[in-house]
Structure formats: C-alpha cells, structure tokens
C-alpha cells in the first residue's frame, strides 16, 4: 500500500473498529502510513477519573515554521444493527462507485485524503518549506474530555506552536465544495427542576403540580427569540431536549419535574450574558401566576453544564483564501463560507491558532450504510494537495 492512495488509506482505517472509546488499531494504522513519510509520531494516552482512557496521536514532519496542522478523529459512532447494513460496517467494501463503512464520511475519509495529499506533495515537491502536523483524537464522538483538548495542551507544553489548522470534518451539505466552515456557534446546556407537592390526582387542591410551573418556564425560554442573527451567524436557538417527572402512575401528581435544554448561540452573546438572560426569563416566568392562580411563585433550581462551547469566527484571510482558491481551482466553483451547524473540535483549536473546516459530503454520516463516492475521495485529495501548496506559498511570502 502507498499512502498516496486515499481509497486504500480509507479502507485500512475503516477496517479498524474504533467505536468510541476503542482505538481499534486505527492509530497504529496511521503510524504505519505517516512514519515512512518522515513524520515523527507520538501516541498520547489521556485519562480522567470517571471516563475511559483514550489513545490519541500527534505526528509532525519538519522542525521550522510556518506550521500547518491537520486535525481530526478516528473514533466513530456505533453502527446500530449490523443486519440493517447493505455491506458490513467495518469491511470497507466498494460497490457501484461508493465505499461503504462506519467512518467513511465522519471522518476517516478526510484523514485518508489529507494523508494522501501530503504524500503526493512530498512525492512531487519534497517536504514542505515548514512543518505539517497531524493531531488525531479517539474522543470526538464521545465526551471529548480525553481527546483534542488534552492533546493540544500536551503538545503546547512541549513547545509546539501552529500557524493555522484545517479540520477535516464533513462540511458539505450536498456536493463536494459547497461549504467551508469558518466558525461555529457556541453551545450552552442546563437542567431545570421545578419543585411541587405530590398528591392524589383527584385532590389537586392538596398538591402542587410542578408540570404547570415547568410549562411556564420552558415557554419563557423558547419565546420570544433570543435574537435575529448577525452578519456572520444565524439566530440563536434554544431547544428543550428532555422533560421528565419520574412518575409511572397516572393517578399521582408528581413532586417534581425536570427539563434539560440546549442553546446554540451566536456572537451577540457570551456564556455569561446568556446565563444572565436565561435566569431573568425564568425568574419573570416563575412569578407569573396566570397558569397557577392562587399559588406561590414557581420554585425551581437550575444546574448548568460544566463546559460551554464558546462562539468563534476565523478571520485569517490567508488561510481562508488558500482553501477557497484550492476548492475553486479543482472543482470550478466558490465554496460558501459558513458558521452553521453544530460544534466540533475546532472549538478547542481556535484557542491556539486560526482554524477552518472542510471535508467530504455529510449526508450519510452516523447513518446505516454510511458511504462516500470514490470519486469524491480523489477530488478531496486534489483539493487538499492544492491547499497545502497554496498555504505554504502564502504563509512563506
């Protein structure tokens, strides 16, 4: 096998059953691809009490700047019922021009293509005038506690510094070249508990149904909208994701009700200002007696998730221009610069260097029969190879 072939690279990676938190042999496979190209490869185990140990990988080619990082993850989500798959999820079979397997799109395909692009660049031009590194985690689809955030810290403590980063997530909605992610909205989660008084459903005057209070509070969180969006970001949106009373009986008024929520927020807010606005809405709704005539204000408490994700926007013109021109040069159209969608590990990388995201088409990620067109693997490799040349030319200018 030669590392210049993205299809062979991807088949090797898919055949490693690396469902989070299992490494499945994927990092060893990467080591075998990168070391012959001249990369120095380190495997880094990260641990934290109450979580699974995670194997990560950091590889670097070159010692000088400018320094370009490629970041990604080899862990994948569970396959579900294997009987539902047309082709076995870890067999990496090709059928009718498509390569099937868990991780084909998200995101072993992006890693396979960038390795092939680096190998082709070296084959044609020799090592780049600077450094290229791979920062690969096995904990992106999981809690993301022992993955990219700790690997970045480990590398930085050893003197690693980066000038730019490309994350190979599947950013394209419909066709390869549709979209480059240049930022992400923030994410904040919390859990509200409303306290009532348990009682018999036939004697509501002797109880206090917390569901009524919860309706008031959740409605206040979702309406009115938090904002109308900004020049770079879509409107912030809050969604109630769970509601629970822990009560299997139909004739008992529950003692408490809980609801979890998540808000994806734009650059109109910080996590701190958003918490303040949410508490303002909850306090106002708790004192509104229209749904609870004659009752005291709703008694509630709120617990915030430990680690909010902060909104960010990359404005590094050289990085964005190098990638945009590579896409346009290979496929003939300009990609949209976007901040839509969920979060990714770019939220950690932005604290170290400018970061953008570009990879395959994401239509089948996490689905049964996840697959990628073989032609897209070749095209993405060509885009990545062109990007590498453009970025080093611009960074060294």
Swiss-Prot record:
Q: What is this protein called?
A: Succinyl-diaminopimelate desuccinylase
> Keyword annotations for this protein?
Amino-acid biosynthesis, Cobalt, Diaminopimelate biosynthesis, Hydrolase, Lysine biosynthesis, Metal-binding, Zinc
Domain of life here? Bacteria
Family to which this protein belongs:
Belongs to the peptidase M20A family. DapE subfamily.
Task: Outline the subunit composition.
Answer: Homodimer.
Q: What class of enzyme is it?
A: hydrolase
**Organism, as annotated:** Rhizobium leguminosarum bv. trifolii (strain WSM2304)
Q: Which GO terms describe its biological process?
A: diaminopimelate biosynthetic process; L-arginine biosynthetic process; lysine biosynthetic process via diaminopimelate
Please provide an example of a Pfam family that matches this protein in its UniProt record. Peptidase_M20
Function, in words: Catalyzes the hydrolysis of N-succinyl-L,L-diaminopimelic acid (SDAP), forming succinate and LL-2,6-diaminopimelate (DAP), an intermediate involved in the bacterial biosynthesis of lysine and meso-diaminopimelic acid, an essential component of bacterial cell walls.
């Amino acid at each position: 096998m030669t590392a210049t072939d993205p299809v062979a690279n991807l088949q090797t990676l898919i055949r490693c059953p690396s469902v989070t938190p299992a490494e499945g042999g994927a990092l060893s496979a990467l080591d075998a691809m990168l070391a012959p190209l001249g990369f120095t490869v380190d495997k880094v185990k990260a641990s934290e009490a109450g979580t699974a140990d995670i194997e990560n990988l950091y590889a670097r080619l070159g010692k000088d700047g400018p320094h370009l990082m490629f970041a990604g993850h080899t862990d994948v989500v569970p396959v579900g019922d294997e009987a539902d798959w047309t082709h076995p999820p870890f067999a990496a079979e090709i059928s009718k021009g498509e390569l099937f397997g868990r991780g084909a799109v998200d995101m072993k395909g992006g890693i396979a293509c960038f390795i092939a692009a680096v190998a082709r660049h070296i084959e044609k031009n020799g090592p780049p005038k600077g450094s290229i590194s791979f920062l690969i985690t096995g904990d992106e689809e999981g809690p993301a506690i022992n993955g990219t955030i700790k690997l970045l810290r480990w590398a930085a403590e050893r003197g690693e510094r980066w000038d730019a980063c490309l994350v190979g997530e599947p950013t394209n909605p419909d066709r390869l070249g549709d979209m480059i992610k240049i930022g992400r909205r923030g994410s904040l989660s919390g859990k509200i508990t409303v306290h009532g008084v348990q009682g018999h459903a036939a004697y509501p005057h002797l109880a206090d149904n917390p569901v009524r209070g919860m309706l008031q509070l959740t409605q206040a969180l979702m309406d009115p909208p938090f904002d109308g969006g900004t020049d770079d970001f879509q409107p912030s949106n809050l969604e109630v994701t769970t509601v629970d009373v822990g009560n299997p009986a139909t004739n008992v008024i529950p003692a408490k009700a809980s609801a979890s929520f998540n808000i994806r927020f734009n650059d109109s807010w910080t996590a701190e200002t958003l918490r303040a606005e949410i508490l303002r809405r909850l306090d106002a709704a708790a004192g509104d007696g229209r749904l609870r005539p004659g009752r005291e204000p709703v008694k509630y408490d709120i617990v915030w998730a430990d680690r909010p994700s902060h909104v960010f926007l990359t404005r590094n013109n050289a990085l964005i221009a190098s990638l945009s021109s590579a896409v346009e040069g290979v496929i003939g159209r300009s990609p949209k610069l976007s901040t839509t969608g969920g979060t990714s590990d770019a939220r950690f990388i932005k604290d170290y260097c400018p970061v953008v995201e570009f990879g395959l088409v994401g239509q089948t990620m996490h689905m049964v029969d996840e697959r990628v067109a073989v032609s897209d693997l070749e095209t993405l490799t060509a885009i990545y190879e062109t990007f590498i040349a453009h970025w080093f030319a611009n960074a060294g200018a």
